[in-house]
Amino acid sequence: DNGRLFENMVFLQLRRQTTEIYYFSEKNECDFVVFQQGKIKGLYQVCWQLDQNNMNREISGLIEAMDYFNQPTASIITQNQSDTFVIGEKTITAQPFHEWSKC
């Protein structure tokens, strides 16, 4: 399953930076909530390909986590898509894994 393997690749990349990696689940879900030295570093959703069938689910999970952790930005890591979604005062950036992993 490409989705599971892809999520594991993102986890391994995050793990190189910190051990404080968590999962968020309330009404919706966020794949990775990352802290570094006790401070939130990022909110990440992993999606092989964003489309009409999963867009709402992926964004809703991030918006809920952004509200919970009071974060203005979050990321969706994709296989090869780039986009920016501005929802109110929140910004979600979708970017390909190969670009994101260079950071």
Which stretches of residues belong to each language-model region?
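A cross-kingdom feature that marks ATP-driven nucleic-acid transaction machinery
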Residues: D1-C103
